[in-house]
Every structure is written in C-alpha cells, then in structure tokens.
Amino acid sequence: ITLTGSSTSGNAINLTGTATLNATNNITLTGSSTSGNAINLKGNNTLTASNITLTGESTSGNAINLTDTTGTTTLNATNNITMQGTRVQIKHSNITAGNFALNATVAGSEISNTTLTATNNINLTAKTNSASSGVYLKDARITSTNGNITANGTATANGKATHLDGNVTLNASNGRIKLTGNGHGSASGILFAGNNRLTASNIALTGNST
C-alpha cells in the first residue's frame, strides 16, 4: 500500500477517522505540506505490514503527526518501522516492530503517552534548530526485547538536545542504552526531569553543550 500526498493549504495525507491499512508486504506513506501536517493520523487508525515507512516534509507543521487525545494510533510491523521528516510527533500511540528508526531533521521529535516495543533495535535521532527539544520523551514506555535503544539529539539553538521529561521507561534488558546529546549555549546536552527509569546490560550517557 502506497499513499502519496502534497498540499499547499492543509494536511497532505489525512487519516482522521477509523482507518485500517493491512499489507502483506509494505505500507509507505509520503507527504509534503507547506501549511499543515505532511502525514496526519488522528483517531483510531491501525497500520499492519511487514514494513511501515512514513516520510514527511512540512514547513509550518509536523512532518509526521500521530496524535489524538481521544483515539489511539496503532502501528504493527513484523520487520521495520521507519519515520523520517522535518519534525516527528508521536502521541497516544501503540507501536510494535522488529526494528524502529526515527529521524527528525529540523524541528525535533516527540514521543509521549506512547508504548513502543521492538524485538531488536530502537534508534531515535533528532535535530532541532529552535527552542524545542531534539529527542523529547514524556510518559513513554520504550522497550527493546533483544536489542539496543539509542537516542541521539542535537540542538543548534536554545533547545534541549535529549530530554526525558518524566515517566519515561527505557528497557533494553538484553542490550544497551546509549543516550547522546549535543546542545548549544545554555541548552542542555542531556536533561532528565521527573521520574525516569533506564534498564539495560550497559548504559552510556554522553552530553555536550557548547
């Protein structure tokens, strides 16, 4: 299943009800918007496939937006889930994958009120050029059953590079957790706020602010 959308006046790909996409092989969503969200999943939506790929670009909204306070987005992939965009925002979601990779290139990322479970590796990479955080986690339960959890945040302005903002659980009991944050000015490289728990065979934290 392949969906491609482009918009200059709203959301490019917009699933706002109860949508179910099932594919034996791949689900690929690609969106571009200059005034809204490139990919917008709001409501009770379920995507199931071997591989799920979301790619978005937006100049004034979220490149990838999975959020709804009254609904839940569910993503199930036996192999890989890959998300890439200028900003990636994941809220109120349940995600299961073999491997999970997120790359936000301009305005950071957020994972909150979400359960993310991967059989193997989880890689979160995000850069922010504004006051927002690079990798931002809050009320998130992130588990790698047999692999590693890696978060790499970069803040070029006054945002926080890698920010765990409370009620975050990172569990890689059979692997390692590696958090890296590169901040700028008064911004933190790595910031822990509230109650957070990290569990792994090895944990490495590397923070820098220049």
Predicted region positions:
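Residues on the solvent-exposed faces and adjacent turns
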Residues: 5-7, 17, 23-25, 31-33, ...
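Structural detector of coil-to-beta-strand junctions
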Residues: 12, 38-40, 63, 101, ...
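Long, compositionally biased low-complexity repeat segments characteristic
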Residues: 1-2
